[in-house]
């Protein structure tokens, strides 16, 4: 009986192995992983030269076997399914509190955020340099600052992850202490966890009209009202960045955006390119891999990019329906992409700056932006201030 069971087990194992080999052999290679938001390695070119090649980091070369190993990992059959099994085993079977620093609480995916003191201080210094170079002596320049809390601010304590997260109160206090020249706008009283996507880092545009109104009021403007907009739901289902990182199978969510005649008629220029009409990039409102006529692909993998399109260092939004000549300059990260359109109705022109994407850094900003007689808003999330070095 024991021999029979062993024989059956061996047949099952061999059968599974043959099935995986067959699927791997006959399936076409994937170009891009939408769950991981990354390109997948193709089969490496097989030549005598790269067979003999050794890994050499100084020359940026890899051996055939190194490239082949990366290819097999990326193109492994049912890769996403095995990633999900692994994640569920760690979180549910082993009862681990997180998966690589990411966790789920009350249906919301987020990550632990210990303080990165070095990056945080460098970013405060970068903001100070911008102030001293462009804002301090600019005539009639009104400077404001607001910090957007990440989801862990709301979830760390109830989920039991507060000991492994930074002291948010101290973080906000340090920002204010290092930027005494700015008029600080506290957003904590108009935000809660329901204002954020469940599977992504960002906030939901349809839920932050009150945030935009508080910012506008603090800057002396009337601000938007909910009735100024109609809500439009995008057709495709939205899966945020945490969906692929945590790898636990959960339902996607709807992505809504706010429409108005004012927003539809705005003229938007990205990095000096000719202006286009409207603040939304409808090509990016879907999830697909689009082949280019001359080879390669256009990847539309993050539906959040519908807001002010792709990452750009300098975006100019002109409002032809403005009843004022006031102008606003916003230094921002990706959170600003969905919020800034809500401020358009109170300004004739909004210049949007993301210093991370400006070629050559910020030392020549005054060639493109005049800061005199402007409202200037520094709008950064705790995520970026704590993890990504600003230029």
Q: What does each model-identified segment do?
A:
Residues 1-391:
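Extracellular glycan-modifying ectodomains
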